[in-house]
Amino acid sequence: VEHSYLKGIIMKVLIIFNREPYDMTDVSWNGLRLARTLLKNGHDIRIFLMNDAVDMARDVCKPPQGYDQDLVKMLKELIADGATVRVCGTCMARCGIHANQPYFDGAEKSTMQALSEWVIDSDKVLTS
């Protein structure tokens, strides 16, 4: 169902990911799918990775055997299509299975201050 009141409205949507990418649920995968759909519909998508979700911005993070989705690849595709991705700088050394591994190009090392500014400036804030 198409809602005419939504036509022409561009929203700034911030999605904050917290969970380990491959935690035996589809929470992160569905968050990335939502981001892709919103981006495709013309919205300004901002993604902030913190806690164990920072692994999603690391090339060393691979899908476990039997999992049919590559979340790192999905995140890179979102960046290539215009989504802005920031990753907690403090979490780089503290969080994830791959702590201290670098973030890939396009995933900007960021701060809590930058996240707080995004929260204030976004029309919608979602957490996953």
Labelled PLM ranges:
Residues 35, 45-50, 85-89:
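Short internal beta-strands
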Residues 61-65, 102-105:
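Short glycine-enriched, charge-decorated loop/helix-capping segments at active-site entrances
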Residues 13-29, 57-62:
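Short, glycine-rich nucleotide/cofactor-binding loops
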Residues 1-10:
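Short, Lys/Arg-enriched N-terminal segments with co-localized hydrophobic residues
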Residues 97-117, 121, 126:
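C-terminal structural segments of small proteins and small subunits
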Residues 54-57, 94-95:
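Short, active-site-adjacent cap segments at secondary-structure transitions
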Residues 27-41, 47:
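Histidine-anchored nucleotide/phosphate-binding helix
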Residues 63-92:
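A glycine-rich helix N-cap at a beta->alpha junction
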